[in-house]
A protein has these predicted regions:
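Acceptor-binding helix/loop patch of EC 2.4 sugar-transfer enzymes
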Residues: 54-55, 68-76, 130-164, 310-312
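Short hydrophobic beta-strand element within catalytic cores of glycosyltransferases
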Residues: 297-304
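Short N-terminal targeting/anchoring amphipathic segment
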Residues: 10-15, 92-114, 129
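C-terminal amphipathic helix plus adjacent low-complexity
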Residues: 1, 350-433
Length: 433
């Protein structure tokens, strides 16, 4: 499709921001001469691009903030705000219908979160693309974002309810969406073929030349920036660092939480490397991607480390030191000791993100979805999904949750009976307790 024809796309991106993805896509489409708006139903504290300033969107966010901050203990107020926020979503939807011909939905949410909305979009021939980022599609029983091991263990009944709800929601999306973008690590519930997340990438716009390396100390400077300490395994990482200090290593540990992105980027410019998280299902999540733009390598722990090379093609795997959680200490030690390895890995990561994951390049790949020009190798068959390690929790905790679910409601409660091999893998995992 010619550029002039491509420019006819008017894209809605929202209704939530996840790790700057919406903002990155808006910036990327802008560079391609395509109009896109990021509109959010809740305020996003780390917003890096200007969003549309209009009273109808401002009220939507105010209602969303009030809804989010109201406890369920204040039931009357909570119910009233939920109803008002959802109703206001219909005003946003009605306003958006004539303005956009493509809708990119993040976080597993839509403007009104209703069947009717998706049916209307389909009837009006709007392009619908769902972009999944983790907890919005991952089975709840292997999702540390929902159930960190540090929190109280959910009842099997509640877990069963959430699992059925997640599977049903994805089924609704599959019924109406033109395309589904997901990672093979979180596509266990899909029935339709989906687009491989790693083939598209994370859209990031970082000008590292605006920063400079101010590192002067002799110690090794390591940065960690968890959105949630429990989910990211921060306490285990700190314990590993303490043992390394006992060995005589000089370590300057920078732990950043709840700070503006500008503070994070400044620290990335000053560090030697980053430790992202302990239980990741991707070699390079958003924080590690930001570090890569500065040429700073990442140590990443996760059970997907043992599967990634057999599931993702080599040219799509972003460079990092991606290891099993139990190897996190030795990985950090290697990064401290081997200057050449650290520098080379950082440069490989920088080259990868600058040549593959820039906002313009990633937006260009999403444009191919809009124009139905999709390379065959982007497609993934959900029948091939094999990963059971989850994210954000130790495997031992996932085993407990899976076992609880099976004992109370049977194997079918896993909601993967359409994939017998995957179902058996979950059963085998639970039996190892």
């Amino acid at each position: 499709m010619k550029k002039a024809e491509s420019a006819q796309w008017k894209i809605f991106i929202g209704p939530v921001e996840i790790a700057g993805i919406a903002g990155g896509l808006v910036s990327g489409f802008s560079k391609l001469g395509i109009y896109a708006e990021a509109n959010f139903s809740y305020p996003y504290p780390f917003q890096s691009i200007p969003v549309v300033s209009h009273w109808i969107f401002n009220v939507w966010q105010l209602l969303g903030a009030a809804r989010a901050h109201t406890s369920k203990s204040n039931l009357v107020r909570k119910v009233a705000l939920v109803l008002l926020h959802n109703t206001w979503g219909w005003l946003i939807f009605i306003r958006s219908l004539p303005r956009f011909n493509a809708f990119f939905f993040l976080g597993g949410q839509t403007i009104t979160n209703s069947n009717l909305e998706l049916w209307l979009l389909k009837c009006l021939r709007k392009k619908i693309i769902f972009i999944y980022t983790g907890s919005d599609s991952r089975p709840p029983y292997i999702d540390g974002g929902r159930f960190p091991a540090s929190s109280s263990r959910p009842s099997a009944k509640y877990l069963n309810t959430l699992t059925k709800r997640c599977k049903k929601k994805l089924g609704l999306h599959e019924k109406f969406a033109d395309y589904l973008v997901n990672s093979p690590a979180t596509a266990q519930f899909h029935k339709r073929h989906y687009i491989n997340w790693f083939a598209l990438g994370i859209p990031k716009l970082i000008n590292s030349s605006n920063f400079y390396d101010k590192k002067t100390q002799d110690s090794v400077r390591i940065v960690h920036s968890p959105s949630s300490s429990g989910v990211k395994g921060t306490s285990v990482i700190i314990a590993a660092l303490d043992r390394l200090r006992d060995k005589g290593f000089l370590i300057d540990w920078i732990n950043i939480q709840g700070k503006p992105n500008s503070v994070v980027l400044d620290e990335l410019s000053r560090c030697d490397f980053v430790v992202d998280q302990l239980y990741s299902d991707t070699p390079l999540a958003t924080f590690a991607t930001e570090a890569a733009f500065f040429g700073k390598p990442a140590v990443v722990g996760g059970y997907f480390a043992s599967d990634v090379s057999s599931i993702i093609s080599a040219d799509e795997i972003p460079p990092s030191l991606f290891v099993l959680p139990e190897l996190i200490e030795s990985a950090i030690e290697r990064m401290i000791l081997d200057d050449s390895f650290r520098f080379e890995l950082g440069q490989k990561a920088k080259q990868f993100v600058e040549s593959t994951w820039t906002v313009e390049l990633v937006a260009g790949r999403y444009l191919k979805l809009l124009e139905n020009e999709i390379p065959d190798h982007w497609w993934r068959n959900p029948k091939d999904v094999s990963y059971v390690g989850g994210c954000g929790m130790p495997l031992s905790y996932a085993q407990l949750l899976i076992s609880d679910l099976i004992k109370k409601f049977g194997v079918s409660a896993l909601q993967v009976s359409d994939k017998p091999e995957l179902e058996q893998a979950f059963v085998s995992l639970a039996s190892e307790i």
